């Protein structure tokens, strides 16, 4: 098990309005100016958009896999995942769900992935 940045790139490439940006040596995936996923510099952890009110429960349910973002990012709708703890199927689910949070509902509804 375990996924890479290249796995993520392949997943997000077909997502409408999605693009990659490098900010402070960190790869981020965006829709417009909104970041929906970001890889930490060492590429072992990925932060992704996730409903703020659900993140504590997610982290508590699988603490070896998910973790809360650093204190400076707690104000965002964000949670983190250890990349060595997931497979490509789960990565796809996390990325597509995060992307859906950031695009207009019509765009999300039109996506068949």
Predicted stretch roles:
Residues 1-113:
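Charge-dense, helix-prone N-terminal extensions
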